[in-house]
UniProtKB/Swiss-Prot annotation:
Protein name: Sulfate adenylyltransferase subunit 2
Annotated gene: cysD
Source species of the chain: Pseudomonas fluorescens (strain ATCC BAA-477 / NRRL B-23932 / Pf-5)
Record's signal peptide: none
Superkingdom classification of source: Bacteria
Enzymatic class: transferase
Annotated EC: 2.7.7.4
Quaternary structure and partners: Heterodimer composed of CysD, the smaller subunit, and CysN.
Reactions the enzyme catalyzes: sulfate + ATP + H(+) = adenosine 5'-phosphosulfate + diphosphate
Molecular function terms from GO: ATP binding; sulfate adenylyltransferase (ATP) activity
Length: 305
């Protein structure tokens, strides 16, 4: 029967199976919602998994307060339209210290507002499993991570201490204080994601589509002028270099740390065609991935998703 399914239907069935397994095995799961395309697909799959009922777990957004404005608008619209049980968490310590990506740099901003914020939220609500939309094709440390990614009581990941996963059998045993991060989209590619969004009609943030936007090039990365805060950290010479270009985003994060790409792709079919021809990683525009050799693995060892 499986052999008669299309490639995307096989991926869909695998992801739904994983989501249902976690809901059945764990006492208090949560689905992380970063508002991006992978989160949109994962949320769609979860709703399919339990249709016509509601999700048996909440969704949670760890807010750095530096997401694109269109992302916040989209999040609020989805919560209202889908009736989601949304938890938002902002690291109060980071807010008190005034942490931001300009003054403190990408590494410290990510550690305090994302990693520590996530760990705070998981501890506060006692979640023992957290769904995430990471895929193995994104980045080398994610490529070697299991679907069930076990974390110790400090939320740390040890890549040398992973359990075997045979076929579709997952070992969900955890000791008190431990938890897992689970990745239902592990075996999907960026192209799979876009084709599935097209076929299923899944809503996504408009920033994924090419449009004329104000940007400034910093260290080879096109940074979008999303709100007034960025202007406070630009010199007069830099402000003079702000230009309008037709750009879109292949990945979405904190806007000062996420680069746009020049593109003509204004529709889903345009994006799919672009994906068939591209030879660069979607995360080439993520500044945090360039903090140092092995930076993503180091972040994950400390509790980053």
């Amino acid at each position: 029967m499986v052999d008669k399914l299309t490639h995307l239907k096989q991926l869909e069935a695998e992801s739904i199976h994983i989501i249902r397994e976690v809901a059945a095995e764990f006492d208090n799961p949560v689905m992380l919602y970063s508002i991006g395309k992978d989160s949109a697909v994962m949320l769609h799959l979860a709703r399919k998994a339990f249709f016509p009922g509601k999700l048996p777990f909440p969704v949670m957004h760890v807010d750095t307060q530096w997401k694109f404005q269109e992302m916040y608008k989209f999040r609020d619209r989805m919560v209202e339209e889908l009736g989601l049980d949304l938890i938002t968490h902002v690291n109060p310590d980071g807010v008190a210290q005034g942490i931001n990506p300009f003054t403190h740099g990408s590494a410290k901003h990510t550690d305090i507002m994302k990693t520590e914020g996530l760990k705070q939220a998981l501890d506060k609500h006692g979640f023992d499993a957290a769904f995430g939309g990471a895929r193995r094709d994104e980045e080398k440390s994610r490529a070697k991570e299991r679907v069930y990614s076990f974390r110790d009581s400090k939320h740390r990941w040890d890549p040398k201490n992973q359990r075997p996963e045979l076929w579709n059998v997952y070992n969900g045993k955890v000791n008190k204080g431990e938890s897992i991060r689970v990745f239902p989209l592990s075996n999907w590619t960026e192209l799979d994601i876009w084709q599935y969004i097209y076929l299923e009609g899944i809503p996504i943030v408009p920033l994924y589509f090419a449009a004329e936007r104000e940007v400034i090039e910093k260290n080879g990365t096109l940074i979008m002028i999303d709100d007034e805060r960025i202007l406070e950290h630009l010199s007069d010479e830099e402000k003079a270099r702000i230009v309008k270009k037709k750009v879109r985003f292949r990945t979405l994060g904190c806007y000062p740390l996420t680069g746009a790409v020049e593109s003509e792709a204004e529709s889903l079919t345009d994006i799919i065609q672009e994906m068939l021809l591209t030879r660069t990683s979607e995360r080439q525009g993520r500044v945090i991935d360039h903090d140092g050799a092995g930076s993503m693995e180091d972040k994950k060892r400390q509790g980053y998703f």
